[in-house]
Amino acid sequence: MMDRVRAVALGNSPADILLKNGRVVDVLTETIYEADVAIAEGVIAGVGSYDKAEKIIDLKGAYVVPGLINAHCHVESSMAVPEHYCAEELRWGVTTLITDPHEIANVAGAAGIHYMLEAGGQMPLNYYVNLPSCVPATRFEHSGCVMDARDMIKLVNEPGVLGMGEMMNVPGVIYNSAEVQKKLDLFQSLGRVIDGHAPCVRGKELAAYVASGIDTDHESISWEEAKEKLRNGLAVLVREGSASRNLTAILRGVIDEGVDVSSLAFCTDDKHLADIRREGTIRHCVQMAIELGMEPVRALRLATINDARIYGLRRVGAVAPGWQADLVVFDNLQSLTPQAVFHKGVDALKACEKITPVTPNASLQGSVKPAAFSADTFALSHFADDREYPVITMLPGEIFTEKSTIMGKDIASALEKGDVHLIAVLERHHGTGNVGLGLLRGYGLKDGAVATTVAHDSHNLIVIGTSPEAMNVAAKELVRVQGGYTLVKGTEVVDTLPLNICGLMSSAPAEELIGSLDEIAAKAHAQGVLDGIDPFISLSFMALPVIPKLRITDMGMFDTEKFEFIK
């Protein structure tokens, strides 16, 4: 193979594909120059003046850019299967992605990770998995699986496994949890990258966290936080997703202070499928950076070579001889609309059309198994008249919540007025019968219920409603379809979106899935869900007991400031 690549490089043999008359974006020297790109055997054989090839494509001055890299994402957050998610990424020029499948791991453990590896691994892009490090995320809820260091040892050498996923257990790292240290030791001994997750961790605690072997962080929300992490030796992944949008705040500081960008890269973390379809992922980050005043070639560094170097990906991320022929052709560097996308010298978009999605095994399609329940499970009789109860107060446009209270004797009238709603989390993995029951305000639903099996991070069944009867209907509908979203009016099901894989993802085509998501959300808003509240996504975060101030899990109402359950 290399003999032929050398012959093409020397001009003695025709290339497989010749990209003629292009402008090469060189992220190694931050320059742009006119050249042809000769591709042979899946790699770039030469960049310069070439004439011979099996296929010649005249670019007419278009820009040849290294394939873009998404340094950190969660495929499951799109609710699309890996094949359909990857196809959307490729449409916008991403040829390498690094995913942390901790959502499906919390439901199905190693079986879920194997599915993600198989499904994504057949796609025409570089698809890497960082093994989830925190399954479950906390001890305050029941997940479908528990993964310790011994489980990770069994997976670490699987094809496609790159490093360790985000280490969310910051106290466990800083204060030397034995189990956390075993995980860190495993990946450090193999020379693998360890992703961090350190929101608002500063000072000496940050130093201890980084000194333990953490390599990256994607949780900075300000330039000052990002700068401190850079000074402590972390690679900072600049996040621009659907809910968490931190790029502008960080890059304004980078541009204003003129700092070196070698340890900066772009990622999305969580991004909705409709947003990806509309604007892409990393391409959107590059466009935003350029609009903020960053030079286009420098912005593209944060989307290509920087990511590759941070994660140790050899010969990926630049347009140079001997490097993998992962390339994107753009007409211009303003609109950044891909004209062609190549992976290992193959037209990646055409290659996508030939791929059939993997059929998940039966265990991944039958994961909603709560113990028996009825309307009585959600009844007002669980609340005593003479007691004060905490109420989760939702905030429009935020996943943070506030705390309020209500006397038990006032709950029935508040429900009738729509001032509060009932909320419950049913353990759905092992049939334990655990049910957390509580109260919530600020959602706005009228006469019915909403339920979902997407409930971060353990993904139990969460339901909110105006009556126990409506909640019972909604929860039973999700058991019937084995996971997804559902909306009930009165006690009749209005609409259901099945998420047939672990209650997290749909095997429906992307366009169909986007339409279904938009439709059920619109119906929920028409039924009273307030503006600024996503009927399902906002609800899914009410079960995550690591975000202030008040949450609910299958074990009960949880005060995240005191880090304890409310008895």
Q: What do the PLM-derived regions correspond to, one by one?
A:
Residues 5-8, 83-194, 257-259, 494-498:
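Divalent-metal coordination cores built from histidine and acidic residues
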Residues 112, 146-166, 172-238, 245-266, ...:
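Histidine/acidic residue-rich metal-binding segments in metalloenzymes
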Residues 22, 42, 61, 72, ...:
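Divalent metal-coordination and catalytic microenvironments
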Residues 76-77, 104-107, 135-142, 170-174, ...:
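Short, small-residue-enriched loops and turns at beta-alpha junctions
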Residues 18, 67-69, 129, 266, ...:
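Residue-level marker for buried hydrophobic side chains located in beta-strands
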Residues 101-104, 132-133, 169, 199-200, ...:
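Short, ordered loop/turn segments at secondary-structure junctions
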Residues 1-35, 39-40, 49-50, 90-92, ...:
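Active-site microenvironment of metallo-dependent hydrolases
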